[in-house]
A protein has these predicted regions:
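Bacterial N-terminal signal peptides that target proteins for export
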Residues: 1-10
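Sec-dependent N-terminal signal peptides of Gram-positive bacterial secreted proteins and lipoproteins
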Residues: 14-15
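C-terminal motif of bacterial Sec signal peptides marking the signal peptidase cleavage site
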Residues: 19-22
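N-terminal alpha-helical interaction modules that lie
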Residues: 24-192, 226-227, 244-251
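Alpha-solenoid helical repeat scaffolds
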Residues: 80, 193-196, 232-237
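Hydrophobic face of amphipathic alpha-helices that form TPR/SEL1-like repeat modules
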Residues: 155-158, 197-204, 241-242
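Alpha-helical adaptor scaffolds
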Residues: 187-215, 221
Length: 251
């Protein structure tokens, strides 16, 4: 694993050198290329079966993204790549054994995602009045789905680790509206990710708080259908969040 880690650092160093040399030549092209590269690295990590490789490489990858965002703070593609990276690292490797650190990571992911959404024209998501918030969502279109999805998902994950905060809990209705808008625009996004989110949403809440196991099951099954077996997280979440509540030992 030491060799893998060293190679990652070498590749990142070469990338930084190339990018900043190119910056003086064509800054716009450099940003687009960097964003595309980060997105491809993120996609590749999801297909990597050796989790130790991902775990060793992610801190360097996150440092790279922070540096890129620092250099180009207004690029929404870089912002959303950073948001996705921090959320993935927190979910896969940190949350189960260090919830305090995971809360910090999700917070950073949330901030990056909301900044990317602001660049798409949906600003001050946590500050605007609820009516204005709801109205603003109707102006978003399918091309805005990646930004809206990751903003809602990361915001929801952050709230999930701040359940003792009334201020955080008060933001839940906004997250729900955001993900419902994603469902309206593109239910297939990220292997049926919006349905997976809503499945967890309904399964993890008590009935008095809006929980509904039947709706949860429907969303989980739709997510698995849209994922076509490529997104194992849907199956894992179905068993973990739904089966435990429904006492279905066959799942």
């Amino acid at each position: 694993m030491k060799i893998v880690s060293n190679w990652i650092w070498i590749l990142l160093l070469l990338l930084f050198t190339t990018l900043f040399q190119a910056c003086s030549f064509n800054k716009k092209m450099t940003v687009v290329s960097a964003a595309s590269l980060l997105e491809e690295v993120a996609k590749s990590s999801y297909k990597q079966s050796e989790l130790r490789v991902i775990q060793k490489g992610m801190p360097a990858y996150l440092m790279l993204m922070d540096g890129m965002v620092e250099a180009w703070p207004k690029n929404e593609r870089l912002l959303i790549a950073a948001a996705q990276g921090y959320a993935s690292y927190a979910s896969a490797f940190i949350e189960d054994h260090d919830r305090i650190y995971a809360r910090t990571l999700y917070g950073k992911a949330k901030d990056y995602a909301l900044r990317s959404l602001a660049r798409r024209g949906f600003e001050r998501a946590s500050e605007r009045s609820f009516d204005d918030f709801e109205k603003g969502l109707t102006n978003l279109r399918k091309k805005d789905v990646p930004y809206l999805f990751w903003a809602a998902a990361n915001w929801g994950s952050w709230i999930g680790l701040n359940l003792n905060s009334m201020e955080a809990m008060a933001q839940l209705p906004r997250v729900e509206l955001m993900m419902r808008r994603v469902l309206e625009l593109d239910e297939r996004f990220y292997y049926g990710g919006p349905h997976l989110f809503m499945g967890i949403w309904y399964a993890s809440r008590p009935k008095i708080g809006g929980g509904n196991l039947k709706l949860a099951q429907n969303h989980f099954k739709r997510a698995m259908e849209l994922g076509e077996g490529k997104f194992l997280m849907a199956h894992v979440s179905y068993a973990y969040h739904y089966a435990r509540r429904a006492f279905d030992k066959d799942l």
